[in-house]
Amino acid sequence: MKTRRRDALIGAAATAAAAGSLPAPAIAQRVKELTMVTSWSENSIPYQISADRLARSIGAISDGRLKITVYPQNKLVGAFETFDAVSAGVADMYHSGDNYFGSKVPALNFFSEVPFGMTADELSSWIAFGGGQELWDEVDAPFNIKPLSCFNEGVQMGGWFNKEVNSAADFKGLRYRMPGLGAEVLRRMGATVVTTPGGEIITALKSGAIDAAEWVGPWADIAMGLDKVADYYYYPGFHEPGTSVTLGINKTLWDGLAASDQALITVAAGAELTKSLAESNAENVKALTVLRADKRIKILPFNDDLIREFARLSKEVVAEIAAKDPLTRKVADSYMAFLAGIMDWGELSETGYRNTRRLALS
């Protein structure tokens, strides 16, 4: 009996000693190393810093068990190659705007940006509670991708120009950097539209390769240096009223994760979505003050005639995209029905209150 007890104690001591020589996380479970590719330049505001923060959050919430290495554009794949890289398993996840892939998968436009479409809050409501997420999953499933919303900057600006634009005629021959469905709207107005990656916009403007460019809003645009290369800053960004950025995850990887890890990533993405919008609003307030203080810069609205023309062509473009295939039609119908309902509610709530506040504080 004493011999058996002694042997058991020796065995337990050996096990404890071995465990003590390992880092704490390794005792519990192995570290899972993942790769994230993005469509943004290193340290670019606001997109890349949000992607980096999301990766850190997932690592922290998992107690280091999920370790994500982030590769900005061109470090592993190009800015517009992230979707295909994750689909093929070259990378585990991407951080990008799905409007970059709308020519490949038309329905994806509705989960990113639609001219004169939903704002950030409205889009989040449709995705979370209006059937949008289920449709998004259906759209991405054939490409082996699980999509989640992880960023939104809110209503964007209309862009920087090297001259005033007062009529549709001013867009004819204009070389303009713009992605997504808005690009097709301007193309129909006679503009020469290019989808230049964000990191190349300044060079293109300085060299004269383009005459105008939209990026995001005051905070991001100042960080990029757009205020140093153009004088006319137009609003509103009719083309991107609330562009959502996607965390696209390889579905084979996703399906192999424990339910707790799927929930962890979903919660982290949702938290970053909320934080990114709050951060962008706060930083845009400060950046707009800087721009207003620069007398060289003219902050101007697109006039009513231009807005009407943008709207007319946007309706054409969205209708044509919706007719591309049955699934895109299904997505478009859901999107437009939700938009109609939330616009009705918004007139009584958000718009109604803001109009009242303007009157009260004027």
Annotate each PLM feature.
Residues 128-132:
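An N-terminal domain-start capping segment
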Residues 2-3, 7-20, 25-123, 133-134, ...:
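N-terminal secretory/targeting leader peptides
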